[in-house]
């Protein structure tokens, strides 16, 4: 539909008053216009299709640069006749000149539609059915003025009205009535028109798809029923009732004439009606068939698109699964250190396969991301378990070393016990009996008993290690892949690093009662990392029990040694507090922060682990030999302690005037730059002790 508003032409003439006299249509009315062009169009159903066809014809003529030709339009009861306009016209005749070149000629009943363009009121057109080809042709014209185009359209409408009114009048006349308002010449003209129409219908022989009753144009409704009103636009469509009446009246003009049979013509009309109904049904069936076909095509296209989308989604899921598999393989390569003899039976690969099988049935990306995070938490747990296993392996190695050392000590004791009696006692008499064979037998029996005890301890240790490994394997198998990562992690402890480590006492050399005889020569578990190797931490969140509960004798020895060392530390702390010498705390292996906080001049003097380790490496012997050896070690340690800590001392006086001696062992300040900083002892020697102590000993 056109977007511009419909502008009516200013026409002061009333529509109820005819534009032309009825007698003029029997002679013909002539108009001058320009012929734009014509084109075959399908049967129009709406006004929009007619307007589109009209504008399409104008556009094509403009594109092809076709010149508009001046024509003369003759409108009469015979029809609309379009001829070329001559340049020189001698005289005006009401009759048509046979020498004129005829372009178009359509009878009134074949005109289907007449209208003008709402956007350009100078343009008008009409659609008529061609008799030879039985197709619709749209002819477009352009007038000189807008009012002239309106007059041409109304003239065509009035011509149809005159024909319709004449047929109604002829139908109301009786056959014997000779009175008539119309002259004999006019009746002859109407009869000739009707005969010509019937002959054309007979020539078609029922080949038309449309009956003549729909081919006539109903410009105005029946005058007997309605009064003419001024329309908003001049789109005039035919009505079924008027078409039937006009067709029947035109046919009755000759039917009621004498000597003409009425039955064949009525049969022809009935056959035409049936043919029209069948043609209408076939058109409806074809329309439904085309609609179903279009729906089928759209459904097939939608199905093809859906299949393509599913294929694309399957390809994306396959790529995601391959990526997950590659991530699992990458994690396995990173955790290659777990494949040791202790955890060779850990079901890592089976769990990854189970994860891949579970994710292959799940296409949701959120669950895939959650499972990837679960993999990360599982890897963290596996690494922590691997650290625990490595610590257990180190502990087992330390136990083996301890057993070897104990065996060596026992062998040395046996050698010493065998060498001592031979050197101390003279050989016995030849004839007398000696008690030494019985003593040797007792010693062999005691050695056998000790060996049996050692074997039992080793068996208990091996069983305990096997139980620990089984427990770790069970924990590995019990890891839930689909669990929440926050639940799978170990429980945090109260420390700042969320993990508390304890030192396994069995990873160190046990302190026997012979070694613990001296106060300072005993083994100290607190500060002796270099004596027996590194201590392996074990998280309390994963192992809360003692891994070597079966070795009762070793645990008892270790407990006694720890208690004795703690007692020695307490005595040394008391002596240091009473004497004011905080440097003596270094012999115990720990630095007291409570006493050093009172003086900023106190310097750290940690004892060397090598000196302590030299005191701890004491081979056990007999009871007498052990006592002598312990006494010597005590004297050596005390003398070395006095010489080591009395070399550099600082005298500090407090506010009360008491003097105390503090160790001034230098602790060098490390710098990242090349700046040379003097030693702390050199700096403190230049400070006055009294003024310095007033500010620092509060």
From Swiss-Prot:
Ranges where the record places region Disordered: 191-240, 396-460, 588-698
Role noted for this protein: Putative adapter protein.
Superkingdom, taxonomy of origin: Eukaryota
Tissue specificity remark: Expressed at higher level in wing imaginal disk.
One record GO biological process: postsynaptic actin cytoskeleton organization
InterPro entries: Adapter_Engulfment-Domain (IPR051133), PH-like_dom_sf (IPR011993), PTB/PI_dom (IPR006020)
Lineage, highest ranks first: Eukaryota, Metazoa, Ecdysozoa, Arthropoda, Hexapoda
Record keywords: Coiled coil
GO MF term set: nitric-oxide synthase binding
Compositionally biased spans, kind Low complexity: 396-423, 448-458, 590-640
CDD domains tied to this protein: PTB_CAPON-like
GO cellular component annotations of the record: glutamatergic synapse
Record's protein name: Capon-like protein
